[in-house]
């Protein structure tokens, strides 16, 4: 059963009427979620694996047997299905896929290998994002730069930042992947052996799979069977992650003014996508409950979100994926001022 709470009143919940949930503890919100949200069910977890494997197989059959002019459609399907593999690994990284850690680690490495994503590297960096969501200069996922940091950067860096926060937002996860996940200095000494293992796994996969693919199908086969679906996967990775925490209303705060409850409930966006995308990607778009507790498996996110809407509805941001939303994000959410919110690049002129 969901614990029902009375409607919140700013003066009753916070010393700051403009931030009515800032003084709440994260646990206060989690306690209102049904216990069923946290139940791991092996049948549902492995069903998600079967859905992903079936969708990927269907996509590759289409790439092989359908006429060449169908390739854009089969690439989109296959890349979206590969995003589902990432989400399976995502649950493994949060230990919400299986009860045994070794199962999570094994499945996570297998799911991430075709994406050339080092599992432990991602897991550790992603844990940091969850611990410091929307904390200025600490969060490592789409943390917007200040005007001062932007202006102090070299011209080439500013150019790349303009592109990624603007019309080329869909490449953002590629840069994040390449710059963050293979650099050992990004990780604590105690974690580096695990990171090295994960990097070795993806290097081994690439060393075996890529030459085999090129030898048997040529360079065009490499492009057709791996590169294009991989780019579609990164389109979704970039899109999902930027939408998760980037609309003009979302606030980023300095560490001394940061609230976990506010950041996770009121600093995260639920976005509806075409249903086939949500199915293939295992509801990764149902993101608010995931930020409240990473222990919620992906197949229970909708149950948790329904409870949040019932109890905390006024504090939730919900959007629908469309061109207008992406124009708003890429056209307005460029630089950040803690006092006034987002600023556009054009405002610097």
Swiss-Prot record:
Listed transmembrane segments = 46-66, 68-88, 102-122, 168-188, 199-219, 222-242
Task: Give any single GO term for biological process.
Answer: unsaturated fatty acid biosynthetic process
Motif Histidine box-1 extends across 90-94
**Names of required cofactors:** Fe(2+)
Could you tell me which residues belong to the region Disordered? 1-20
- Cell compartments where the protein resides: Membrane
Keywords, in A-Z order: Fatty acid biosynthesis, Fatty acid metabolism, Iron, Lipid biosynthesis, Lipid metabolism, Membrane, Oxidoreductase, Transmembrane, Transmembrane helix
Q: Name one Pfam family in it.
A: FA_desaturase
Which top EC class is named for this enzyme in its record?
oxidoreductase
Membrane topology label: Multi-pass membrane protein
Recorded domain comment: The histidine box domains are involved in binding the catalytic metal ions.
Report the family membership.
Answer: Belongs to the fatty acid desaturase type 2 family.
Q: What is this protein's record name?
A: sn-1 oleoyl-lipid 12-desaturase
Q: Which organism is it from?
A: Synechocystis sp. (strain PCC 6714) (Aphanocapsa sp. (strain PCC 6714))
């Amino acid at each position: 059963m969901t614990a029902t709470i009375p409607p919140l009143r700013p003066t009753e919940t916070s010393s700051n009427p403009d931030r009515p949930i800032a003084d709440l503890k994260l646990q206060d919100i989690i306690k209102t979620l049904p216990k069923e949200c946290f139940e791991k069910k092996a049948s549902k977890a492995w069903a998600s694996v079967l859905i992903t494997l079936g969708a990927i197989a269907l996509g590759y059959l289409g790439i092989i047997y359908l006429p060449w002019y169908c390739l854009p459609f089969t690439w989109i399907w296959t890349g979206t299905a590969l995003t589902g593999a990432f989400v399976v690994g995502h649950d493994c990284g949060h230990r919400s896929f299986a009860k045994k850690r070794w199962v999570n680690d094994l499945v996570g490495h297998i799911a991430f290998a075709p994406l050339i994503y080092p599992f432990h590297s991602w897991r550790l960096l992603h844990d940091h994002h969850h611990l410091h969501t929307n904390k200025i200069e600490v969060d490592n996922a789409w943390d917007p730069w200040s005007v001062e940091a932007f202006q102090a950067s070299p011209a080439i860096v500013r150019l790349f930042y303009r592109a990624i926060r603007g019309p080329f937002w869909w490449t953002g996860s590629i840069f994040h992947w390449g710059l963050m996940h293979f650099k050992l200095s990004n990780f604590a000494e105690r974690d580096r052996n695990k990171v090295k293992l994960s990097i070795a796994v993806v290097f081994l996969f690439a060393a075996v799979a890529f030459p085999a693919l090129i030898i048997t199908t040529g360079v065009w086969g490499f492009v057709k069977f791996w590169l294009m679906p991989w780019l579609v996967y990164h389109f979704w990775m970039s899109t999902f992650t930027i939408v998760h925490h980037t609309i003009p209303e979302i606030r980023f705060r300095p560490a001394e003014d940061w609230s976990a409850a506010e950041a996770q409930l009121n600093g995260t966006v639920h976005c509806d996508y075409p249903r086939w995308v949500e199915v293939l990607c295992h509801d990764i778009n149902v993101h608010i409950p995931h930020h409240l507790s990473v222990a919620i498996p992906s197949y229970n996110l909708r149950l948790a979100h329904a409870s949040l809407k019932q109890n905390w509805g006024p504090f939730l941001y919900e959007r629908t994926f469309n061109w207008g939303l992406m124009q708003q994000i890429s056209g307005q959410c460029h630089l950040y001022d803690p006092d006034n919110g987002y600023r556009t690049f054009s405002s610097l002129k």
